[in-house]
């Protein structure tokens, strides 16, 4: 089973993912937690450079990189599935859809980037008011986190997704 937590920046996805993992493990269930983007991989490091202004890419390129980052971990996802683990995702495919559409890209093009990756069985969208999410992180914001108007559009996109 794949359970994904989605939502805008600073919505609590990381916190909720960790809490669910602890709860499931206390019930003696096998779990595996993934966070995307995964900044530990080569492509993830390039995404981090982009998000912090060290690289510039057109929207199509960054969304290809975000999808490639998920593909980098595809074998790990498959291993976790084969071990009957509950897979918990802090962001996954849906983030690329919402952010990509907000960046002016077409839904069908974005969906094709992840074709073949396992789909989530349950997607939980965390909806936090923009004012609160901005209050949660005041420093070291990335490219998307700094832009209040973009953040508002992302929130609207997740509401449509839900």
Residue spans for each PLM region:
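The start of beta-strands in P-loop NTPase/AAA+ ATPase cores
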Residues: 1, 85-86, 122
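ATP-dependent small-molecule kinase phosphotransfer cores
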Residues: 29-115
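Walker A/P-loop
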Residues: 14
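Hydrophobic alpha-helical packing residues
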Residues: 20, 24-25
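A glycine- and Lys/Arg-enriched "phosphate-lid" helix/loop adjacent to the NTP-binding pocket
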Residues: 96-157
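Hydrophobic anchor at the beta1->P-loop junction of P-loop NTPases
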Residues: 3-5
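P-loop (Walker A) phosphate-binding loop of NTP-binding proteins
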Residues: 8
């Amino acid at each position: 089973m794949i359970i994904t937590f989605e939502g805008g920046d600073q919505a609590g996805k990381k916190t909720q993912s960790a809490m669910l993992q602890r709860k499931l493990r206390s019930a003696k269930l096998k779990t595996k937690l993934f966070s995307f983007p995964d900044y530990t991989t080569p492509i993830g490091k390039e995404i981090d450079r982009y998000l912090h202004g060290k690289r510039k890419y057109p929207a199509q390129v960054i969304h290809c990189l975000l999808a490639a980052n998920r593909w980098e971990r595809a074998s790990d996802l498959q291993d976790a599935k084969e071990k009957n683990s509950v897979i918990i995702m802090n962001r996954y495919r849906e983030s690329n859809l919402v952010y990509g559409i907000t960046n002016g890209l077409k839904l069908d093009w974005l969906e094709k980037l992840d074709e073949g990756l396992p789909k989530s069985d349950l997607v939980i969208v965390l909806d936090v008011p923009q004012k609160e999410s901005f209050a949660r992180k005041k420093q070291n914001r990335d490219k998307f986190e700094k832009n209040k108007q973009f953040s508002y559009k992302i929130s609207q996109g997740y509401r449509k997704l839900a």
